[in-house]
Amino acid sequence: MENGRISSNHVRVKMKNGSISSNQDSGIEEKETAMYKVRLANAGDIPAMYEIYRPYADETTVSFEYGAPPAGDFAARISALFSVYPVLVCEEYGQVLGYAYAAPAFERRAYAWCAELSVYVESSARGRGIGSVLERAIAALLKRLGYRKLYSLVTQENTASVAFHEHVGYRQVAFFPEQGYKMGRWLGVVWLEKELCDAGCCEKFPLKMIELFDADRTLEEVFG
């Protein structure tokens, strides 16, 4: 923790043939191996995160926003999460290729052990395992913070995202038809759930990120 802010800790993640392992070397050893760095996001990352998100809101039904919000509003939205929930970026050679964060799933206090996942990957970097790396890190951090359930709400027609979530351990728990209207059509929403721990693991309210990183300053064991 530096000056009351969470430091930009990171872990290097090697992707080879679809597998994930932590690695402290720099560079790419062979063509089929990509080296990514997953780290805590900071205010300096927000412009890159905004540019990744903007096409999702402007051009797709992945986001139910009718266009990206003003950059300042987006920055305020992300900044409000930093001290409480994990907000991560995945970069390669200093370029942010994707980001993910957790946020409250519901408002009432009894839901405090539930969080909602959001993952966004730059269009040219999709299909390279970045979403899996980010999801794994978010889930691992939430488990350490003391969360029990992680949810993701996916537009029904986004079948690739539904398949992705099922591949990384989520199960469909609900489907709500015609919940949103965008781009001239009604859209159903699939609710997916990942259980992070059993009912006995959550005797206290979850920690905040700022509390976790007072005691533990590294992301390395997330991928241990």
Model-predicted regions and their roles:
Residues K37-M49:
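A short beta-loop-alpha structural element at the N-terminal edge
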Residues Y50-R77:
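Conserved GNAT-fold acetyl-CoA-binding loop/helix
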Residues A68-S124, E135-R136, E195-L196:
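Acetyl-CoA-dependent GNAT
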Residues Y101-P104, Y151-V154, R171-G188, C197-D198:
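Conserved catalytic-core motifs of GNAT/GCN5-like acyltransferases
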Residues G127-A140, A163-H167:
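Conserved acetyl-CoA-binding loop-helix of GNAT-fold acetyltransferases
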Residues L142-V154:
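Conserved GNAT acetyl-CoA-binding A-motif
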Residues S152-V162:
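Conserved beta-strand-loop-alpha-helix junction that forms the acyl-donor binding cleft
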Residues E178-G224:
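C-terminal "cap" of GNAT-fold acetyltransferases
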